Amino acid sequence: MTQLADLRRTYVLGSLNESDVAGDPIAQFKRWFDEAVTAKLPEPNAMTLATVGADGQPSARIVLLKGMDEKGFTFFTNYESRKGLDMAANPRAALLFHWVQLERQVRVEGRVEKVADDESDAYYASRPLGSRLGAWASEQSREVPGRDVLEQRESEYRAKFGENPPRPAHWGGYRLVPTALEFWQGRPSRLHDRIAYRVEADGSWKIVRLSP
């Protein structure tokens, strides 16, 4: 087995100073996200979503960012999945973007809310047919006897709905409204740059540097 203690790299690609960042964290995120897209990183909108259930047990998984503006970060999923149940019990959640090739991370913390039905409807309608049928066929996070059961359900819903399945009531969007963001840039000697934004009582953002 590979010696885990020997797996390391030196970070040399960039730096991040307080004078470099935008005054608004969403503008700063858009700047970095656009650079990740320009660099042709695979799935730059992939993010880890961390939630905590009613029992206090945390869990995390990769989801895809599907919208982002001054209101927050939007993603879509099954409301009855583990993450959906977690967020119903505890709306506090966190996101993590890791753009390895750029030696960058972005952490986002905040509260999650469901988006309006028309927003969920519009995104659902834009998905490929297979994905729309999959939202019906999968009772997400529940045990299933085998893959053949999923494929049978998908076939049944395809026969039922044809080319125009409606959005299931149990599927839709969430928006994480941020209260804190951190931008991390790898640096040599593990003295990484960490610039954090924290929302103030008046809605403005305070920018601070954190020790690595």
From Swiss-Prot:
GO terms for biological process: pyridoxine biosynthetic process. Pathway: Cofactor metabolism; pyridoxal 5'-phosphate salvage; pyridoxal 5'-phosphate from pyridoxamine 5'-phosphate: step 1/1; Cofactor metabolism; pyridoxal 5'-phosphate salvage; pyridoxal 5'-phosphate from pyridoxine 5'-phosphate: step 1/1. Binds 1 FMN per subunit. Signal peptide: none annotated. It comes from the Bacteria. FMN binds at residues 61-66, 76-77, 82-83, 105, 140-141, 184, 194. InterPro entries: Pyridox_Oxase, Pyridox_Oxase_CS, Pyridox_Oxase_N, Pyridoxamine_oxidase_dimer_C, Split_barrel_FMN-bd. Its EC number is 1.4.3.5. Coiled coil: none annotated. The keyword Oxidoreductase applies. One of its GO terms (molecular function) is pyridoxamine phosphate oxidase activity. Catalyzes the oxidation of either pyridoxine 5'-phosphate (PNP) or pyridoxamine 5'-phosphate (PMP) into pyridoxal 5'-phosphate (PLP). PANTHER family: PYRIDOXINE-5'-PHOSPHATE OXIDASE, PYRIDOXINE-5-PHOSPHATE OXIDASE. This is Pyridoxine/pyridoxamine 5'-phosphate oxidase. It comes from Cupriavidus pinatubonensis (strain JMP 134 / LMG 1197) (Cupriavidus necator (strain JMP 134)). The gene is pdxH.
